[in-house]
UniProtKB/Swiss-Prot annotation:
Histone-like DNA-binding protein which is capable of wrapping DNA to stabilize it, and thus to prevent its denaturation under extreme environmental conditions. Gene3D superfamilies: IHF-like DNA-binding proteins. One of its GO terms (molecular function) is structural constituent of chromatin. GO terms for cellular component: cytosol. This is DNA-binding protein HBbu. Belongs to the bacterial histone-like protein family. Changing V90I: In strain: VS102.
Length: 108
């Protein structure tokens, strides 16, 4: 697998792929409803992360919020000036075993 020129997949592409998958299983669901489900999923994900909840999808991975320590000598990449970065929270994703095996070709 080469990472030099990776294709960019958008939400619309995912909606199209899910729609095709559903049709291949002899089901019918309009794309607008698929988009609503995807939007609702991401709103729930964001809302739970804002509440500092850990979100686990077995075999896929875990989303959580972690605290990142601040630094005194961070550098602004655009200006080169030194700035102080305070402690802050970041969203973090930890891939699950099945995802690691599938993406990285690792057998656990």
């Amino acid at each position: 697998m080469s990472f030099s020129r990776r294709p960019k997949i958008t939400k619309s592409d995912i909606v199209d792929q899910i729609s095709l998958n559903i049709r291949n299983n002899n089901l019918k669901l309009e794309k607008k409803y698929i988009r609503l489900v995807i939007d609702a999923f991401f709103e729930e994900l964001k809302g739970n992360l804002c509440l500092n909840n850990v979100i686990e999808f077995r075999s896929f991975g875990t989303f959580e919020v972690r605290k990142r320590k601040g630094r005194l000598n961070a550098r602004n990449p655009q200006t080169g000036e030194y700035v102080k970065v305070l402690d802050h929270h970041v969203a973090y994703f930890r891939p699950g075993k099945d995802l690691k095996e599938r993406v990285w070709g690792i057998k656990g």
